[in-house]
């Protein structure tokens, strides 16, 4: 009972993280609050991977919904035996928590790549990735940010928002990983038997 309540609390934490991921990803389409750059496709290419909107956002909301349903006491009657039902619920919980790790992990990786690549901006040489060849060193050298002439403050905009996405998706990965460990501990530590019985399956 205690582990189930704990699992439900962890699942609930995923909801605000997913909603914030959607909001932050949407903001990446509007550097400095302007819409013209999205319509003219003058944004960093990693924005178009929809890492925050789709994977760390919508897909995580779906995963969270399933996990919360599985935590409901009334959903332990999927077969004749209560023990059998618990086994299937545990298995499904592990599967969907693992999917959560995959979805949020995707957002984490893409956001990190977007952060290291730097923004797509207008320089004296035209529109380009001004810091693409710096291997992320520009992140700690604010003196070279002036190379980006347009959009205004786009370097800060990208750094802040991609960093937030990395944090949000990282927390999602941790929460889903904890859920997997909790469910596996039920099996390995013998909270209930997971030996399949021929007469049940």
Curated annotation (Swiss-Prot):
InterPro entries in UniProt: L6_membrane (IPR008661)
Keywords: Membrane, Transmembrane, Transmembrane helix
Membrane-spanning intervals of the chain: 10-30, 50-70, 94-114, 158-178
Positions in the Cytoplasmic compartment: 1-9, 71-93, 179-201
Topology class, membrane: Multi-pass membrane protein
GO cellular component: membrane
Top-level taxon in the UniProt lineage: Eukaryota
Extracellular-facing ranges: 31-49, 115-157
Subcellular location(s) of the protein: Membrane
Protein name: Transmembrane 4 L6 family member 18
Organism: Homo sapiens (Human)
Gene: TM4SF18
């Amino acid at each position: 009972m205690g582990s189930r309540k704990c699992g439900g609390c962890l699942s609930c934490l995923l909801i605000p993280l997913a909603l914030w991921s959607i909001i932050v990803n949407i903001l990446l389409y509007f550097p400095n609050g302007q819409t013209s750059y999205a319509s003219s496709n003058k944004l960093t290419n990693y924005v178009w991977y929809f890492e925050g909107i789709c994977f760390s956002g919508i897909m995580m909301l779906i995963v969270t919904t399933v996990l919360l349903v599985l935590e409901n006491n009334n959903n332990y009657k999927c077969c004749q035996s209560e023990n059998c039902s618990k086994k299937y619920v545990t298995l499904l919980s592990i599967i969907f928590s693992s999917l959560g790790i995959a979805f949020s992990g995707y957002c984490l990786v893409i956001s990190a790549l977007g952060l290291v690549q730097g923004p797509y901006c207008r320089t004296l040489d035209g529109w380009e990735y001004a810091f693409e060849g710096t291997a992320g060193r520009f992140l700690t050298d604010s003196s070279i940010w002036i190379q980006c002439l347009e959009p205004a403050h786009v370097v800060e905009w990208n750094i802040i928002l991609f960093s937030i996405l990395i944090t949000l998706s990282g927390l999602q990965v941790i929460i889903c990983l904890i859920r997997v460990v909790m469910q596996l501990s039920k099996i390995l530590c013998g909270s209930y038997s997971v030996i399949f019985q021929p007469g049940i399956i």
